[in-house]
């Protein structure tokens, strides 16, 4: 038996084990009648009401939850359920305009069951540990801690030598290819009824591209979408210091040449998948220089300490708002106590980072304006 034949045999054994595990995960879900059981739909229907019970539509939904759940479950089981229209509006978040498509609460009930009972159990096992956006036990600050750990690990081996490759996707949600999502469904969801339902949610966006912001299955689909790229970086390229948060990637390499070679490989693989790479934000930076990841500034000192600073634009906004509130307090529209309560928001944000100096500056500015301590 040649080495090539042994390699092929090992590959086939791995494929067989993966297929067996995938089948076991799908068998654990059960048929569509068990996944969308009345109990599960009622439970997640109540979950949808949390935090929005002041809305009239939510109150009507909860008032008729018993009968409405039975009606929607009947439509799902006989294959006549279709996603309804969404309420479209735009948000301007820190200067970034984001189009939001909010589904009706009746559709949110179905979406939540699909996400919690189907997409999460089937997608998460194929995702790397360093992909924890919108996942239980994860989040943005989880990724800050992981990046700090990866920087310290690299420093212990290579010191300040090396480089980072930072990558960002362009229009990650608006230009998501539906064909890639359907391909993932065919590989992950073996039950044809559940796969058809997941395809319906994707097909609700016309044009064959794009996933809406504000829809729960959309968020889970997009988190897991680049999993093949993640596994290529982690498994095939064997890069320990690599992770991504939604559309933001970083990889830590021992040299600038290795970072440039990895950048070409990763960008080529991403574009082959149909994902658009933002060339303006994708770059190679020296390990010894500070860089930004998800609006936070990271820097490794000569002693190996990792310093993390919050977004500096927040200080500009806080100072501008304090001067605005000064005029409102003078006119009687606000009280000093209300301003002090608001100031806790930027202070609490910067207390998560190595920004004690910025916290002191905000407190001093508040004292200079209102002659009292916060």
Write out the residue ranges for each language-model feature.
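Non-catalytic, polymerase-adjacent accessory regions of viral genome-replication enzymes
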Residues: 1-70
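Reverse-transcriptase-like RNA-dependent polymerase core
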Residues: 74-96, 191-204
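Right-hand nucleic-acid polymerase module
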Residues: 1-16, 103, 108, 112, ...
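Conserved pre-motif C helix in the palm subdomain of viral-like polymerases
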Residues: 97-128, 207-235
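Active-site-proximal segment of RNA-dependent polymerases
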Residues: 28-31, 115-175
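Short Gly/Ser/Thr- and Asp/Glu-enriched loop/turn motifs at secondary-structure junctions
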Residues: 86, 243-247, 279-280
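Conserved polymerase palm-domain catalytic core
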Residues: 145, 149-246, 250-265, 285, ...
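Conserved phosphate/pyrophosphate-binding and hydrolysis machinery centered on Walker-type P-loop NTPases
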Residues: 58, 62, 137, 211, ...
């Amino acid at each position: 038996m040649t080495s090539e034949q042994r390699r092929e045999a090992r590959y086939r054994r791995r494929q067989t084990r993966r297929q067996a595990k995938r089948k076991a995960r799908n068998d654990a879900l059960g048929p569509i009648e068990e996944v969308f059981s009345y109990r599960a739909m009622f439970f997640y229907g109540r979950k949808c009401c949390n935090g929005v019970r002041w809305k009239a539509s939510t109150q009507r939904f909860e008032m008729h939850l018993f009968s409405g759940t039975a009606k929607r479950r009947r439509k799902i089981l006989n294959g006549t359920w279709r996603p309804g229209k969404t309420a479209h509006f735009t948000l301007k978040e820190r200067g970034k305009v984001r189009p939001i498509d909010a589904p009706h609460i009746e559709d949110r009930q179905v979406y939540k069951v699909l996400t919690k009972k189907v997409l999460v159990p089937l997608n998460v096992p194929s995702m790397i540990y360093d992909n924890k956006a919108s996942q239980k036990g994860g989040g943005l600050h989880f990724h800050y801690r992981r990046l700090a750990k990866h920087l310290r690990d690299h420093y212990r081996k290579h010191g300040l030598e090396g480089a980072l490759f930072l990558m960002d996707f362009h229009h990650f949600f608006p230009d998501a290819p539906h064909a890639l999502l359907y391909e993932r469904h065919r590989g992950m969801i073996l039950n044809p009824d559940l796969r058809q339902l997941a395809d319906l949610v994707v097909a609700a966006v016309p044009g064959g591209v794009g996933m809406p912001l504000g829809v729960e299955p959309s968020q889970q689909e997009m988190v897991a979408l680049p999993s093949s790229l993640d596994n290529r970086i982690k498994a095939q390229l064997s890069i320990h210091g690599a992770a991504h948060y939604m559309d933001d990637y970083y990889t830590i390499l021992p040299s600038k040449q290795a970072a440039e070679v990895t950048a070409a490989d990763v960008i080529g693989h991403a574009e082959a998948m149909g994902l658009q790479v933002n060339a303006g934000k994708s770059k190679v930076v020296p390990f010894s220089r500070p860089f930004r990841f998800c609006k936070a500034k990271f820097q490794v000192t000569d002693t190996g300490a990792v310093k993390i600073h919050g977004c500096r634009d927040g200080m500009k906004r806080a100072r501008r708002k304090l001067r605005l509130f000064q005029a409102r307090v003078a006119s009687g529209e606000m009280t000093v106590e209300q301003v002090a309560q608001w100031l806790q928001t930027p202070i609490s944000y910067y207390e998560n980072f190595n920004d004690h100096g910025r916290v002191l500056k905000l407190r001093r500015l508040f004292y200079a304006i209102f002659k009292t301590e916060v």
